[in-house]
């Protein structure tokens, strides 16, 4: 599913450099607040105690929230927000991710810009100047200091500036899954919970048995996400983004190591066949089969939502799997011995530049994303399995994210809900995993200015992945040129989006730095 979502998002147009205009149709009155006061009053609804902000307008207003989140969940959240703030009407508008960007630009061109939006492709949002700077609210909000550490430490959503344009809405931590039944069948010892990258590679090799006694080959790894994307973050704690990005510069020599290692595993026969290939039909007897249902794969680089949405469902009980989570390993033993940076999927949101009530819009965005009150409400709806999506599936099984707050009450409630059908042993493994995944680094196209332009116009256009995977080229052969290209695209984007002709938030020193990067990397 995620492959289709990402493919659709990345294929969408990134044209029409429109400055967001229009409004919510609420008149010309504006809330004068530029910060969050932090003053609240306790309100109880359905046994949940909320901290209702007291610094919002008391006018009757309407806010439009345009999103591609799970629709029924958002409607539930919107209803609760309106119950808390009865003077605010929330118009929650869902759009399928495949048409989201085009529909949003149409709304902008028709003077119907929503007040709050979601987005994944940061180049799309930034090049169209859709997002306002919410740093005044963010920096004064007590809750933002209690999020996963990298959100503030690495400026996630700031895009290398002192401003803040994006906030994390949906957080899907990076995770490695191991089928313990496969390890038992092969008499392979489970790796340490503080495993290293080398430990993982060894496990993949140890669990690949092509001539197995039962006549069906065992593979060490079934992949959904490529290992090179993981390696680019796992290599060092100084890395803040894919392709060895340190916050300013790229270094694709880091990526090249992981890319080559993954290619060597594929060429060496350690990676399970993928769906809709002749290799899959030969192995599982079904062109449409998925290696995650084989019972013959040790490790999976699947998405976070695959466990609840697939493996935890009744339909998969027949496959005799024992799937447990592991944190994405770090390369060095020192990093692996403690909590460390790991790749994550994060969808972002922001307040648009035309919003007439930015303080209230920020509170709505917070409720829909990282806020403690919003997460208390999410846990309530996820616990109620009678509330379903259009297909009749309980909402906890429909691409449910994880909290990005570190609030203990939220996490206790989330783990109890997430692990409600597990025994104590498996619950303990999930508790340990969740405690170790709160240094997320988002995929580059969601978090680094110019990243997708680089991928679209250079990296993907010459097909580097395919060339290396087929053994016709070495990743290291591209590292130097790709580094120059990535730095040029990034510096160009920083000047375009944030320089004098854009948001105008760069200092003279920063402008000089990026101008020099453009010159040096022509």
Features from the language model and the residues they span:
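Conserved C-terminal helix/tail region of periplasmic/extracytoplasmic solute-binding proteins
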Residues: 408-522
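Short, well-ordered beta-strand elements
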Residues: 58-69, 88-93, 116, 165
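Extracytoplasmic "Venus flytrap"/periplasmic binding protein-like
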Residues: 80-149, 184-187, 288-299, 315-318
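A structural signal for short loop-to-beta-strand junctions that line the ligand-binding cleft
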Residues: 105-107, 115, 142-182, 219, ...
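Hinge/lid segment of periplasmic solute-binding proteins
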Residues: 36-55, 120-175, 324-327, 336
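Extracytoplasmic/periplasmic solute-binding protein
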Residues: 117, 157-169, 174, 199-257, ...
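Extracytoplasmic/periplasmic substrate-recognition and gating elements
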Residues: 83, 89-91, 186, 314-402
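Glycine-centered hinge/linker elements that transmit conformational signals in sensory
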Residues: 204, 245-282, 323, 327-333
